[in-house]
Amino acid sequence: MNKKYFKKYSWVLILSTSILAPMTLASCNHNVAKKEDKTQNDSSNLSNKTNKSDPNDHLKDKDKNVSQDNKDSTNKAVSNENSQTQSQKTNESSQNTKDDSSKTSNLITNQNSSSNTKSKIQENKQSQKDQNTSAVNVSALEKQTKNDENISLVNSKDTNVILKNDEKVALAKDDSKEKSKNSSNLNLKTPVENRQNKNEVKDDKKALQWWQKLNESASILESFSYDQTSLSLTFKEGMPLGLEVVLKLENLDSHEEKEISFKTTNGKVQNVLLTSSNLTSGKWKIKSFSFDKTYSHSPTIETTFDFKTNEKLKQERIEKIQKAIDKYQIKIKQNYKDKPLISKYALSNFDLNLNFKDLEIVNNSLKFDGSNLNQDLKSEKQMKITFEKVSENQANKTRKAHFKITTLDNLVFEKTLEWSYKTNKEYLDEFKNGSALWDDLQASLTSVFEKSLWHPYQLPKAKSKINTINLINDVSASFQGYDYLDDFNGSAKLKFKLQRGQEQRDITFTINGFLKVSLIDPLYKGNLRNSEFDVKASSNGYWLGQYYTAAEVFKHYSNGKSYWYATANDGNPWLEFS
């Protein structure tokens, strides 16, 4: 075979391959489309059979139809994908064919270039025609593939229409089981619906919040306040529930920065507790705050506040209470300044100056509100003052009262009151003729004896009444006995022990006003004694061979027995005349 015929034969073979390959692919796509049509017809027949079945079983059949429809839909999707894949392969094959044809043509041309220049030109023209023919075939194949895809989409839509008609027929046949079917429909959501719901949720999350729509210079914080324990932030619009907000605070003195995070509540006003923030005492301001760690904003209003730690607040509170207590004035009542015993002092002995109408003192304690003590202590409720004790310095002659003032949370403060006093010894040393204490004792004794019209010798009868006499200035006088009696003058000198507190003093005190024993027989005639008096005695004794009776005393002095003896064994001799 000569070279000329060999070249022609080669070109015929190449052209045949270029034409037959696209036709073969188109035939395959046509067969696939026929199979899909057959599948759709089977699905339609199955749906019609379902409509003719027992109405009581329509739910069960519907489940099967939905399952079958899902399978058909899946098969169609696979078929469409295969068709598209096959079309792509056809295009690639056509392109490869063109490349191979071009390579073969170039190879043959190069081999025969040395023999015939004219043949080479003709061959190039023929190659250009073949390429144009191949491009036309590829374009026809692509159009055929698009037509197949359109037919597949139309068939899919027809299938969906048939399914919807089936559902309407089932609803019309069994209205009594509508709720059950709705429940089944909810459980039989297609994957497409689920994907749509997920997309809606994602769209909601992607929606911008109101503060994200504002520029950085816009103000989103309307107002700000601070109450020693928390910050109150009022935003321009309401905040959603559970949004994480991070506040960045800056100390204006030390430039220290702190971050505080909190979760928002529904509404415009948000409260941020600072009790556990570990902030140091000083002036702070809100430097910025961020939402969900993505959007940051710097306030455009004044947000400076003077933060104080719990220790600082407590210290200031203690100082305020102590300052009020230092100004608080307690006074000792005048008549209690010189009490004999300091152990006998009580809270009632002091003027507390608490603006109380009725003092309810219990166990030397009194409850009151802080405002009664000082107007700066209005926040202090149920304070209490308790009397502790009184101490004294005898050398300086001063006494000091000790009080304890407590708050409701058991903060304890001390208050003292000091004053000068008069000692017990000084009071007892004042007992002398003409003093108030002297006159008081004299008046007390005189009232006893003058009212009784007693003689001095009758003082023993008064002992029970003068055993202890309470005098002024807390002084007491205890009767100790007689010093002497003066019957003729109606006077007696008595012994007493004065006492004030632990201090004592022995005194003698002469009183007058007793009935006097006058001279019965001033002329000593003695003739009136026996006739005027009845004489009685406890006993009559014997002395030196003679009896000395009481009656002998009232005889004339010349009798020689002008005195009376009692017997030796008379333990309590007495003489009575009337």
From Swiss-Prot:
Region of interest (Disordered), ranges: 35-135, 172-203
Positions with biased composition (Low complexity): 108-119
Cited InterPro entries: Lipoprotein-assoc_dom
UniProt feature coiled coil, ranges: none
Compositionally biased region (Basic and acidic residues): 51-74, 172-181
Keyword tags: Cell membrane, Lipoprotein, Membrane, Palmitate, Signal
Known outcome of mutating Y547N: In strain: KD735-15
Family label: Belongs to the M.pulmonis LipAB lipoprotein family.
Protein name: Lipoprotein A
Organism: Mycoplasmopsis pulmonis (strain UAB CTIP)
Encoding gene per record: lipA
